[in-house]
Amino acid sequence: MNVHVKTADQTPSTVQAQDALAILSAWASEASADQIDALDPGIARLVRVQAYPDLRAEYPGDFTVDEAYRATLPDLQNGPASLIKGANRRIQHVGISNFRLPIRYAVQDGSEVMLETSVTGTVSLEADQKGINMSRIMRSFYKHADASFGFDVIEAALDDYKADLGSFDARIQMRLSYPMKVDSLRSGLSGWQYYDIALELVERGGVRQRIVHLDYVYSSTCPCSLELSEHARATRGQLATPHSQRSVARISVELQGQGVWFEDLIEMARSGVPTETQVMVKREDEQAFAELNAANPIFVEDAARLFAEQLQAHSGVGDFRVMASHQESLHSHDAVSLLTEGDTFAEVSLDPKLFPSLIHVG
């Protein structure tokens, strides 16, 4: 085996490399494309490099854009169908999610409240369209950002971004945390309870639906555990306590007619299952809460039906869905239920993360 040791004078110097590159460039300026293609690919790359202009590295803060310049800007999303990647298929929803801004909402008593709101806006995209200019969704929504929001304003925003984007179907969803003053059970104290609420306006096939979602957090005492505890007390004089747990229901309603105020929907939930978790608590309130739970033990099946009983009795509610999750203190798993009324919320397949999303984050 021969070992070749590189010596210092075998390594070209920088000057020699520059000279060699100059010779190569001079040759390439006169050579044909076929001659350059015949070179070793590594060498050919050296002579194919086009001269790159010197560019400014400083941000041009004084540069202004006029219509003529704007017209020269590339717009890939509005390009021809030939630029589409993948299957040339219609997309039901494409847009932006979770852009946030403060929004004023009309309250049932005639006042207004400003709340941080997370907005999701999507439109349909036809098969022969490359894409959408997503910033138009936000710009269209911002035109109405100073209004006092109700579904009429959301509809106006939807009209605008459908027109701006030339889409057939569209959706706006607005998520917020709605505060309500809630009295304690016995002490006379009160505190702010926050309710996760989402407003959703959907247009599909020319038909619009107004939907409200509410997460309601309550305590559920297991009826079976309550009876077993009482059995231990009665038959053996053994102290025992039934298990109860924080539970979450997501109530979704399609609005009809005059619709439903946030406060009305919350009151319906509270009337169905009165064991709502408490805000301000003294000892007498804690005792009262224990009594309230003992008076209203429920399985997760009971919870779904109790909520449904309230919803189906309200004239402002059309289709609805009730999902409940009792996050068991006895078991390592949760107990869940889902009840729907009408076609709006009927579905064959469920999102694998649907029930795990029923969690209260303080």
Swiss-Prot record:
Reactions it catalyzes:
GTP + H2O = 7,8-dihydroneopterin 3'-triphosphate + formate + H(+)
Which pathway does UniProt place it in? Cofactor biosynthesis; 7,8-dihydroneopterin triphosphate biosynthesis; 7,8-dihydroneopterin triphosphate from GTP: step 1/1
- What is this protein's function? Converts GTP to 7,8-dihydroneopterin triphosphate.
The positions annotated as site (May be catalytically important) read C222
Q: Which GO terms describe its biological process?
A: tetrahydrofolate biosynthetic process
What organism, scientifically named, is this protein from? Answer: Jannaschia sp. (strain CCS1)
Pfam families assigned to the protein according to its UniProt record, in alphabetical order:
GCHY-1
What family, per the record? Belongs to the GTP cyclohydrolase IV family.
What is the gene name?
A: folE2
- Name of the protein described by the UniProt record: GTP cyclohydrolase FolE2
Q: Please provide, alphabetically and separated by semicolons, the GO molecular function terms listed in this UniProt record.
A: GTP cyclohydrolase I activity
What EC numbers are recorded for this enzyme? 3.5.4.16
Under which main EC class is this enzyme filed?
Answer: hydrolase
Record keywords, A-Z? Hydrolase
